[in-house]
Amino acid sequence: MHGKNACGRSQLIFPMVTALAFMCTQASAQYRAKDTEWPSYGADLAGTHYRPLDQINASNFSDLEIAWRIKTDNFGNRPEYKLEGTPLMVKNVLYATAGSRRAVIALDAATGELLWVHGEHEGARGGAAPRQLSGRGLAYWSDGKEERIFYVTPGYRLISLNAKTGMPVASFGTGGALDLKLDDDQTIFPDLTTGEIGIQSAPVVAKDTVIVGAAFREGMTPKSMKNNKGYVRGFDVRTGKRLWIFHTIPKKDEFGYDTWLKDSSEYTGNTGVWTQITVDEQLGLVYLPVESPTSDYYGGHRPGNNLFGESLVCVDLKTGERKWHFQLVHHPLWDMDISSAPILADIVVDGKRVKAVAQPTKQGFLYVFDRVTGKPVWPIEERKVEVGSVPGEWYSPTQPFPTKPPAYSRNGVSVDDLIDFNPELREKAKAVVSKYHLGPVFTPPVASKADGPLGTLTLGTASGGTNWPGGSYDPETHIVYAYACNACVEPIGLVPAPKEVSDLRYIAGVDGREVGIMRGPGENAGADSPMPPKKAPGGGFVRLNVDDLPLIKPPYGTITAINLDEGKIVWQIAHGETPDVVRNYPAFKGMNIARTGQQTYNIGTLITKTLVIAGEGQVTTTADHPRGAILRAYDKATGKEVGAVYMPAPQSGSPMTYLVNGKQYIVVAVSGGPYSGEYIAYTLPSAGE
């Protein structure tokens, strides 16, 4: 074990050569080298999740077998049950984050053999981190001579590693590490150890700049209206020198400062970029999907439209200077932060070539812009929306609505959206929702009252539509593929905040119920964290169902194909086996219920030459397979299912693919429930097997 310092450790398991054995076969010769690798989180800097490989296709997908697998349990002092990573593959080596310590591992991409591992022991700083566990990925850089791997630790330190050995690059930062809580144009409070700021997504490397965003606690109960700010920075890839910073909450004399009334920009925080960033290196432009400001559901302490909250912002790659922006939600109140990477797409609209950027959203809207100018490709209309009545709140009277493409998932709730398998269940559902305020997208939260309404019932908010895995794009057909949760219904009620919980006037809750801190699923789960409490009160979450059945009618989860040349939906299918609770419901015996899809939000898609590939987010037990989940393949032209293979647990990280030694592999992260994290690589049987 080679020691970097008291914090970092790298171990070279086997000496690595500059290139592993390469077999020149007919299968590998037909692809360009860049098409056989996966060098970025989203396959490329455009965020396409696309590779034109077709060795695995409709005729053989169901024949896939496990080539190798690696559990992440030992990359930390406890297992993790939320493995969300998508690996990289460059020069026959697969790189991934793993385990509750967020270690970096390098594997032989063909065999899964461990080549090296690097981990950071961050002590109290890692234990207090707002985004823990293994995170979602890494970044790779090479100038043709040197090769480096970049990642951000739970404690918010940017690490540069030698890609061949896993050793820290001494010339970067201080001994290979850059403290991201410093040189951030703010003083992180209350201190550098416990100050709330971090990130779980992969950094992005474009040309010689590494770009890092910021994230905060996942829970829906802010302790204060004040928080650290989520600025975005670019650093020199060789030295770690800060090259630029973009203030997602503008400072005085900066554009957008006047959208924060009563000096609220001075103390409001969050407003980071916690998901993936995309880059057009040719244009020298970076696309930043910005989250909500402090307090997802109550904005009375931050009156105004609150730029650049919930905005897509384009900045210069060299300077970080804002080129254009579009705010998708004015004065955010619904946790509709832009949760996934913008997709860069070269399309043809009305005979004219357009360099576009397409932004999937939780609302199920796909916003499409000219990525050079920021002009919408199709009109986006400002429409009047309901204005609420929560004391002290500030409301925007209008919100932006795209005219094309149409919404690809439900947003807003009406009686027509309720479960409709039979009249009895529909009546029970109507009784449940009678206690809530219903309305279309952008219906505001309400002050919760025990005698009603308890809250506003929403679809297309925190867990709706497309979440962090994002969409995929086929650059040959100009079609976007997006998974969406079509039934992730969430009530938003507000109650006065107890002083011991928060200094906000209102926080998420239900009148008459105990109110407490609502924690995110990864909090206090990292290797340096104390064990989490067994039970914590959560006043804002109420599970809504009817006889344990989903309150909303199917389809629960969908994959949609959207033609970007025309702004039209090509096809939409239910994705995921019908849940056991539905299939085994006594009153449904003998009924022919079409596949419903699944009520989950964290599914990413992989696009190949002919297929759309996605796993399920829930486990089921059927006559066809034991308890587990299924990795499914669809004909990307029609949406017809053409193959399926078994997974022992739900897909929890987006799948990726590559070609090594003439063989195509698909790697997917699985975890959840009692099943700890595991990367599984699938490939076709070798000839003669």
What are these regions (language model features)?
Residues 67, 113-117, 167-170, 179, ...:
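A structural motif specific to WD40 beta-propellers
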Residues 13-25:
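Bacterial N-terminal signal peptides
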Residues 29-55, 396-430, 521-527:
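N-terminal pre-domain segments of enzymes
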